[in-house]
Amino acid sequence: MYEGINLITAIITPFTVNDEIDYESLEKLIEHLLNHGSQGFVIAGTTGESPTLSFEEKVELTRFIAKQVGNRALLIANAGSNNTKESVEAAKALSKIEHINGILAVTPYYNKPSQAGMIAHFKAIADASEKPVMLYNIPGRTVVGLTVDSVIELAQHPNINAIKETTSTEFVEAEVEGATGFAVYTGEDAMTLSAYTVGGAGTISVASHLYGDEMSELFSAMNAGNWREAGRLQRYLTPRMNALFAYPSPTPVKTKLAEKGFVREAVRLPLIPLSDAEKLHLNELLEK
């Protein structure tokens, strides 16, 4: 399923002046991303502002993207939350949508469950989903995180086949070593080269909204064994990747996409657009 899929974009959700999903802008953005290296999309994930999307909006958004993209890219729909029952119902609904290839589920935030609780949570989602589940380990946002041992245990489930791992290259390496036939993606753009060199499958990216061509070149260089060129590209990209998280994401990437005419800067509360001073600072970081 993930063979040859290196660059997956965690796509933003654009909004109109009335705070509705801007499907016209989204349609144009999708085509742009497909033409600039994106081989897949995570729909309504963190970058897609999932916490402020209703369940109905998530279903509608997923259907729209799935219909437009069809079989041109891998599509992962986000069903995760800190409520297992709600996640199960979301997985059931989203996995039935045509052209959806997989379901993303995040470690439960705020509740602070044990490892055993998280394992039970993910197994319940996987049991309910009609499509394979990708785990999402991001303790920087959720407080709790899966251990390598828990990931390896979950990888034995017949309907769990991948993880978006944001912790460290060491975690990526250990999961690759311990889980056969299990795709390990980094969720940190700046770890693209290091994660790939230890056996990672690729990157689930925010930066690919703006630097898709360069990231595609990076993967091409690595796949060709041209490590000096890969290193050069990663050195160029890393400060720009980090700059996109200088303020609450996805605000910076939406700001830059708005400058290019793809979307409005709009984000949903409690996120707010960047101030003029913050925009100036962001541009300084991106130009270093």
UniProtKB/Swiss-Prot annotation:
It is found in: Cytoplasm. Gene3D superfamilies: Aldolase class I. InterPro entries: Aldolase_TIM, DapA, DapA-like, Schiff_base-form_aldolases_AS. Pyruvate binds at residues 47, 204. GO terms for molecular function: 4-hydroxy-tetrahydrodipicolinate synthase activity. Keywords: Amino-acid biosynthesis, Cytoplasm, Diaminopimelate biosynthesis, Lyase, Lysine biosynthesis, Schiff base. Signal peptide: none annotated. This is 4-hydroxy-tetrahydrodipicolinate synthase. The lineage of its organism: Bacteria, Bacillati, Bacillota, Bacilli, Lactobacillales. The gene is dapA.
